[in-house]
């Protein structure tokens, strides 16, 4: 489900920081946040895919270039010692002021005035992105019900089992 990754990207461009998004997710019950997960998987994998799909991206679609800038700086995540977080001194990663500066510079370049986003709002936006995309998948007939989406989110994406799934939370099962 790429929708919640995109929403997380929008939030860091709009005013949140990666560790704030990740903390909102882990406090909710995810085993790790989206940015820590990207660092674990390797930022270069998604970067290669984004480059392949660039020509097909709608011109009017918002595109956040921050992850691309990290990759251009050879920050591929844990495998390179730096990504969204700095792993050079701590295997679990620490917030890196270089990433914060890069985020702020990219937002400024695009004319975005960053404003802090509260953790409650971060979580709401992440869940709404999951729910909207999940409903679209059901509407297109790709999945038979919201319950199927929840099973995938719990077993494949680490959604906290005891929460029931994003579709369950929205009453869409």
Predicted regions located by residue number:
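N-terminal glycine-rich phosphate-binding loop for ADP-containing cofactors
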Residues: 1-173
């Amino acid at each position: 489900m790429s929708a919640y990754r995109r929403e997380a990207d929008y939030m860091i461009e709009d005013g949140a920081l990666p560790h704030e998004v990740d903390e909102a997710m882990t406090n909710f019950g995810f085993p790790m946040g989206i940015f820590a997960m990207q660092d674990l998987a390797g930022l270069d994998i998604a970067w290669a895919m984004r480059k392949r799909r660039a020509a097909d991206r709608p011109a009017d679609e918002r595109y956040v270039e921050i992850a691309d800038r990290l990759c251009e700086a050879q920050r591929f995540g844990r495998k390179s010692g730096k990504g969204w977080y700095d792993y050079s001194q701590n295997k679990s990663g620490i917030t890196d002021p270089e990433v914060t500066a890069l985020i702020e510079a990219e937002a400024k370049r695009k004319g975005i005035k960053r404003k802090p986003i509260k953790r409650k709002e971060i979580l709401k936006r992440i869940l709404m992105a999951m729910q909207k995309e999940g409903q679209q998948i059901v509407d297109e007939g790709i999945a038979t019900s919201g319950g199927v989406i929840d099973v995938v989110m719990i077993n494949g994406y680490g959604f906290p089992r005891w929460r029931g799934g994003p579709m369950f939370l929205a009453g869409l099962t």
